[in-house]
Amino acid sequence: MSVYLDHAATTPLRECALEAWTRAQRDLAATPGNPAALHFGGRRARRMLDDAREQVACALGADIHEVIFTSGATESDALGVMAAARGMRGRDGARDLIVVSGLEHDAVSHQREVASREGFDWEVLPVDAGGVSVLPGVSGDDAPGSWDGRLALGSMTLVSSEIGTIQPVANFAALVHASGGLVHSDAAQAIPTLDVSFLELGLDLMSVGGHKVGAPAGTGVLVARRGIPMTTDRPGGGHERSIRSGTPDVAGACALAAALTEVVSERAAF
């Protein structure tokens, strides 16, 4: 019998997620409907999606209106970093700087190429010998003057996907906000083991991937604070606050909600 230990890469599908997905698919097969439609089937699908959104918000310490369903953490990272940076520069043309940690997942670090093409500067924070990001300023208490008036967005992973070190995200968020920027964090690796609260971390955006918590691959969430400027490069039908257009995967959202709810309940036993 084999024993699976590579949970940092992906996790087995939880039974609760499989049951939620199957139940939702059967309901949708019996009463088809696009959540954006006004007929009975559409309204029912919308209720299913909203119920899933509420469960996810509760699990992540967020407001229901802040939850945007995506295809996974990679898409959430791309949207969270670039859509917010574009939005900030659109509001204030001088904000052309993006600052990230040196431990970001490729989904964030590879946005550098996109950012460069669009005229953004990209700064990477150093990492100490213990695998923890080094914050700028005197003992990490002060944001550098070079950030003032220029910083559009800062991104720092909550837990490194490579070495598992916990990063000083809350302190980083305070520095970024002091410079007038927005803060994003990829929390995909942290959700199974840490108490993660979007509100308490002081974030503006947070990415979560379904397959890291026992939900199906191809499911994910971007938590985005209401009122922040975001300019997506993927216009469409206006779904998910017009940030992530496309007919939502209702069954996938239900499965993700079930998995996250179970993960949170299990953390209390650690």
Can you name each region flagged by the protein language model?
Residues 1-270:
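Pyridoxal 5′-phosphate
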